[in-house]
């Protein structure tokens, strides 16, 4: 999925006809490293402990569901003209996001709890809002960790983005779903039954809405540059994963009624927790797809983080940037550097950021991809700060070794 999106640029799609598009798609499917993609997903799931992260997000989501529902209901209550959008949103929740067996009980409980929120005082409402924001900040921290971002956005900017998503998101989704319901009603009024083509179109619309929402999450939340085609690849993975998980869980509950037998009427709670966990696992794997799409499209497998790898990457980056300056080039992008070094962009980014912190490399934040330029003179710049930061800490016990190895006298030119 990521290869299809990431290897087909917008100009290619506009210039190519339908036959060329199909041929390009078939070629991408044949050459895409599917096995490497599965290996990357498995490796990142294990090394980044995404299962534990999904459990944490499940717990936080359970606590924050009522506050989020309260905010949504408050928006619709403040504007009576949007009342019909609320009904469309509830219908979408039942039909699309949650398996049939638990959708109505969960929605009824959320609506009931959120409806009682007006009885709370000012302090209680503030706590509800802070709980909702805690979930959003947890998501922010998790996605930045997947993209290996060490410095998140400023707290005010993060709160503003998530608050806009929590308030405007349900409203825009409700408008879209209401227009969809109007189309269904009009179609039934004309032909008496919904045509199969219209049913497929509406299902595709629901699929696309979720994919677009996830793509927006992957594009805007990480404090790094994420191309839209990579974010959309992750969004499509999440949307497809939700459909498969929903049908699979519904089939399992129908065939193996273990929870209903043991828990009875209380079975909705453990089933819903399982669904939340599966949902977060799918979202996190979609984020991995979006984050590693650049390296996968270059047929590059992430190398193991052996001791000294970041130092090695920093030396290679300095060598490439020095060569680019000698050729008269105006800097290199992260993807270009990774392609030249045949390595994962996310794997060399920490070393590149360390060079920026040392003021040896400058980052140009212009339109398009960020570019990096070499600022220092390798012939006169001492290598000691880089050696101390990424290779060997000059502690008192190693001072003699540093002197014998002449680390303090070494320049960058001797390294590169």
Curated annotation (Swiss-Prot):
The keyword Cell membrane belongs to this UniProt entry's keyword annotation: yes
Pfam families for the chain: Virul_fac_BrkB
Segments passing through the bilayer: 63-83, 120-140, 159-179, 198-218, 234-256, 271-291
Membrane association type: Multi-pass membrane protein
Residue runs in coiled coils: none
Annotated family: Belongs to the UPF0761 family.
NCBIfam families: yihY_not_rbn
Name by which UniProt lists this protein: UPF0761 membrane protein Mpe_A1422
Organism field: Methylibium petroleiphilum (strain ATCC BAA-1232 / LMG 22953 / PM1)
Source lineage: Bacteria, Pseudomonadati, Pseudomonadota, Betaproteobacteria, Burkholderiales
């Amino acid at each position: 999925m990521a290869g299809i999106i990431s290897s087909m640029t917008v100009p290619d799609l506009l210039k190519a006809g339908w036959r060329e598009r199909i041929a390009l798609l078939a070629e991408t499917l044949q050459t895409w490293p599917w096995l490497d993609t599965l290996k990357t997903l498995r490796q990142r799931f294990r090394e980044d402990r995404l299962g534990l992260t999904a459990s944490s997000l499940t717990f936080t989501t359970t606590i924050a569901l009522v506050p989020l529902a309260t905010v949504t209901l408050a928006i619709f209550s403040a504007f009576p003209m949007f009342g019909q959008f609320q009904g469309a949103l509830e219908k979408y929740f039942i039909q699309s996001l949650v398996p049939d067996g638990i959708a109505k009980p969960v929605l009824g409980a959320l609506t009931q709890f959120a409806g009682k929120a007006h009885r709370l005082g000012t302090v209680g409402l503030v706590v509800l809002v802070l709980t909702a924001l805690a979930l959003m900040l947890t998501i922010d921290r998790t996605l930045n960790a997947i993209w290996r971002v060490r410095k998140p956005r400023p707290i005010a900017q993060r709160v503003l983005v998530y608050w806009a998503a929590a308030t405007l998101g349900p409203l825009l989704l409700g408008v879209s779903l209401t227009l969809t319901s109007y189309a269904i009603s009009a179609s039934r009024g004309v032909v008496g039954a919904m045509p199969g083509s219209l049913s497929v179109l509406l299902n595709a619309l629901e699929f696309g809405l979720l994919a677009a929402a996830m793509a927006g999450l992957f594009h805007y939340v990480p404090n790094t540059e994420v191309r839209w085609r990579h974010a959309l690849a992750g969004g499509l993975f999440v949307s497809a994963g939700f459909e498969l998980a929903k049908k699979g869980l519904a089939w399992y509950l129908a065939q193996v009624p273990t929870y209903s037998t043991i828990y009875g009427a209380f079975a909705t709670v453990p089933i819903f927790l399982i669904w939340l966990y599966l949902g977060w696992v799918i979202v996190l794997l979609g984020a991995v797809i979006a984050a590693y799409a650049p390296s996968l499209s270059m047929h590059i497998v992430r190398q193991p983080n052996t001791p000294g790898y970041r130092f090695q990457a920093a030396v290679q980056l300095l060598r490439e940037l020095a060569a680019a300056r000698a050729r008269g080039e105006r800097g290199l992008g992260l993807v270009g550097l990774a392609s030249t070094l045949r390595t994962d962009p996310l794997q060399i980014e920490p070393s590149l950021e360390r060079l920026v912190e040392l003021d040896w490399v400058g980052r140009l934040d212009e339109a398009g991809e960020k570019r990096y330029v070499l600022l220092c003179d390798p012939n006169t710049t001492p290598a000691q700060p880089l050696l101390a930061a990424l290779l060997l800490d000059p502690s008192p016990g190693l001072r003699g070794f540093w002197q014998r190895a002449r680390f303090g006298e070494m320049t960058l030119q001797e390294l590169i």
